[in-house]
Amino acid sequence: MRIIVITGMSGSGKSTAVRALEDEGFYCIDNLPMRLFRPFVELIEKSGDSYRGIVLVADIRGREFLKGFENTFQTLRDQGHGVEIFFIDASDDVLIRRFSETRRRHPAEEQCTVSEGIRIERERLSTLRQMATRIIDSSDFNVHQLKELILRIVRGEDAETPMVIEIKSFGFRYGIPLESSIVMDVRFLPNPFFVPRLKPGSGLDDEVREYILDNPKTATFLDCFFPMLDMLVPAHRQEGKYYLTISIGCTGGRHRSVAIAEATAMYLRADWPTVRITHRDIEKGQQ
């Protein structure tokens, strides 16, 4: 029988995942004591009901579960059951924002801040996270996107699903994009803003782009930046990310960041075909 354990951080989207799997025909149960789990699996098998499998939800509330899961899972695997562990995570900033929006108390402790509760929860779930067969980062997902991803995974449709990479140029004077996973500051590069004939243009114009990219300082930077992305992008994919935002900023978001963002997108498309590019502040920088 297929057994999926849904676990992870509070506020990461476990309830969304469970609802998706329930609609998909799985029998879902929340925080079943570990000593009852093996008898429960046997009971479902003997019932003859046509469930696609069992989903067990485990989180920080199930102290008994967290103590006994390792031996139980291994026993079930030895009996021929397919046991998968989906650990759903999100960045601390995203979790704090979600708790703020819902006005819920963090379940880790009665009296502590949300950020402290998140720290405690990460410590308690660290072993389970290491055991996970799938780590899913929901930081960049809305409810519908997370549900779609969970269904693709359980249907075996996600193996060929590439990570969507968004390259976003921006101006620091207008703020760093909140959705950023990686932020690169290129304000140290030569600035066309101070060249009268180039100032009215943007990083999309050939003359402006050549002024930036042909500079030796830019060449040295890209020789370091691109190999770094060759390491970072696959690492984010392995951590369960299906969306990655790489934000590149200069002062106004019109010249340097645009040119470097275009060069970065061109470089990454060789290995990651789903690269898209957005120039958030290119028109603001004209003002």
UniProtKB/Swiss-Prot annotation:
The keyword Ion transport does not apply. Pfam families: PapZ_C, RapZ-like_N. Coiled coil: none annotated. GTP binds at residues 59-62. Signal peptide: none annotated. Keywords: ATP-binding, GTP-binding, Nucleotide-binding. Gene3D superfamilies: P-loop containing nucleotide triphosphate hydrolases (3.40.50.300). ATP binds at residues 8-15. GO terms for molecular function: ATP binding; GTP binding. Displays ATPase and GTPase activities. PANTHER family: RNASE ADAPTER PROTEIN RAPZ. HAMAP family: RapZ_like. Belongs to the RapZ-like family. This is Nucleotide-binding protein Ppro_0977.
